[in-house]
């Protein structure tokens, strides 16, 4: 009793995700991370690799990051930005490969609308750039990709 058995500390510098070191630079350049996301050039990871995501319920999405926006525990379903894109194509059922088949869903407006949004100047508003795309596939800030870079030992 009374002895310290666990201590949570910062990791050694060599284990810190290198992309996180760019965050302060981006904030200085853009004023905030949200401003960066508004301006981010998107290089879609899954489009490059020709990947796609099918949910357990049979809904076709561009990637797991977009699919993960559907049901955030802190938001009521339908509040997240992705729902505007879904509602614009007639609802979630329009993305069901079980009802419509893979080809029809893939060639529908949902995927094209997301890709077209990347040219928008802001992530805000009903027809803004899909923010999750800026967060995960913005070219100046990629903590996901950086985690796979080799650590110098």
List PLM regions with ranges.
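C-terminal structured domain segments
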Residues: 106-125
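Radical SAM enzyme [4Fe-4S]-AdoMet core and its adjacent flexible, acidic
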Residues: 1-104, 113-115, 142-151
């Amino acid at each position: 009793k009374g002895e310290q058995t666990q201590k949570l500390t910062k990791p050694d510098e060599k284990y810190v995700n290198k992309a996180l070191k760019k965050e302060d630079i981006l904030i200085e350049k853009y004023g905030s991370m949200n401003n960066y996301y508004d301006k981010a050039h998107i290089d879609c990871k899954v489009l490059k690799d020709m990947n796609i995501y099918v949910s357990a319920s049979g809904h076709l999405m561009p990637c797991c990051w977009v699919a993960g926006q559907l049901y955030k525990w802190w938001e009521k379903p339908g509040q997240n930005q992705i729902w505007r894109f879904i509602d614009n194509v007639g609802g979630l059922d329009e993305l069901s490969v079980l009802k419509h088949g893979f080809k029809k869903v893939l060639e529908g407006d949902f995927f094209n609308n997301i890709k077209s949004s990347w040219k928008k100047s802001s992530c805000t508003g009903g027809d803004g750039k899909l923010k999750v795309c800026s967060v995960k596939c913005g070219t100046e800030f990629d903590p996901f990709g950086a985690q796979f870079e080799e650590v110098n030992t």
